[in-house]
From Swiss-Prot:
ATP binds at Q101, H286, M287, A288, D289. It comes from Pyrobaculum islandicum (strain DSM 4184 / JCM 9189 / GEO3). This is RNA 3'-terminal phosphate cyclase. GO terms for molecular function: ATP binding; RNA-3'-phosphate cyclase activity. Its EC number is 6.5.1.4. It catalyses: a 3'-end 3'-phospho-ribonucleotide-RNA + ATP = a 3'-end 2',3'-cyclophospho-ribonucleotide-RNA + AMP + diphosphate. It is found in: Cytoplasm. It is an enzyme of class 6 (ligase). GO terms for cellular component: cytoplasm. Belongs to the RNA 3'-terminal cyclase family. Type 1 subfamily. GO terms for biological process: RNA processing. The active site is at H312.
Length: 348
């Protein structure tokens, strides 16, 4: 039975494609997506989307139609789920994090452990930075029982990319439900401020501004300063994350840009993290839209909270409901949004 998805639904971006391909590949259900990225100024598939599609096709021996730059229709029919070692080259500064987002749910149910070596952009606009994936995404997924490790070899920024990341995924039988509406007691705030092919003071100023901004709000943060000179081009950024006594992790990040003061970058990341901490939720807005896939696949009722009901989140819930017999509940309680679903306890 083919699943038909209208790519112009909700936020109408690449997220619809990523979630649809991930669930199609995992469940072995063919999917046809039309009006892909219909609401974007450059509609249709772009190189980084094609990498995610072709990587999912490689892992599942899929038949695909419409996998070309600018295509607004894609047909994807998966066959056998493989595992092992795979090299994926995005070929541009396309986001490595977004490729991981597509492939992680598939590989958790693969027949054996998998190692992915991915080349592309590690810290680019409109995507979670790689340190967010390493320290927030991986830790939140571990609450569901997922075992994923992400190793950063080299950073890659826009426009040249060239970053390299190694991802290890251990297969599991079933994901377990997660029931955390409260963040818990704050244990520590950590961070990494990086600068590549730039003076050390850029990373130092980002870190200092982040720590000072958080200190004014009563938070203490330990931020590691990382400088490298092995990039294909210059770039900088900062990722902060807060951990609680019950294992919840939320993050805030910002990317350096030409002409943007380093202090502003650090302050922006700190303010984003503080805004989430203030609400006492268990998921930051970025993680909430990624978590719904795992909540639906897990065994039992999952209940989590986030600080914003973004269009990304609502769109992702809708896409998951097209593939799985689940119904999400999204309810506003004070400053929080409670996400609840009875997961199907998927197993291969």
């Amino acid at each position: 039975m083919i699943v038909k998805i209208d790519g112009s639904y909700g936020e109408g971006g690449g997220q619809i494609l990523r979630t649809s391909i991930a669930l199609s590949a995992l469940l072995g259900k063919p999917v046809e997506i039309i009006n892909i990225r219909a609401k974007r100024t450059n509609p249709g598939l772009q190189p980084q989307h094609l990498t995610g599609v072709s990587a999912a096709a490689l892992l599942t021996d899929a038949d695909i139609e419409g996998a070309a730059k600018g295509s607004t229709r894609l047909y994807f029919k998966p066959k056998t789920l493989k595992c092992g070692t795979f090299n994926i080259d995005i070929g541009t500064a396309g986001s490595i994090s977004l490729v991981i987002q597509t492939l992680a749910p598939i590989l958790l149910y693969a027949p054996c452990p998998t190692k992915l070596v991915i080349t592309g952009g590690t810290d680019v606009a409109w995507a979670p930075p790689i340190d967010y994936m390493r320290y927030v995404f991986v830790k939140v997924l571990s609450l569901f029982g997922a075992k994923i490790a992400i190793e950063l070899v080299r950073r890659g920024h826009y426009p040249r990319g060239g970053g390299r990341v190694i991802v290890y995924v251990e297969p599991i039988k079933k994901l377990r439900a997660v029931h955390y509406v409260e963040f818990g007691r704050l244990v520590k705030i950590s961070g990494i401020s990086h600068a590549v092919n730039l003076p050390t003071h850029v990373a130092e100023r980002q870190a200092k501004a982040a720590k000072e901004t958080l200190a004014k709000l009563g938070y203490v943060a330990e931020v590691e300063v990382e400088t490298r000179s092995d990039g294909l081009g210059p770039g900088s950024g900062i990722v902060l994350w807060a951990e609680s006594d019950i294992g919840n992790v939320v993050g805030g990040d910002a990317l350096g840009e030409r002409g943007k003061p380093a202090e502003e970058v650090g302050r922006e990341a700190a303010e984003r993290l503080a805004a989430v901490l203030k609400t006492g939720v268990s998921l930051d807005p970025h993680m909430a839209d990624m978590a719904v896939v795992y909540m639906a696949l897990a065994e039992g009722r999952s209940k989590m909270s986030t600080s914003e009901a973004t269009l990304h989140l609502q769109t992702n819930m809708y896409i998951v409901e097209q593939f799985l017999p689940v119904k999400f509940k999204l309810e506003k309680t004070g400053a929080r949004y409670i996400i609840e679903v009875d997961g199907i306890g998927y197993s291969r």
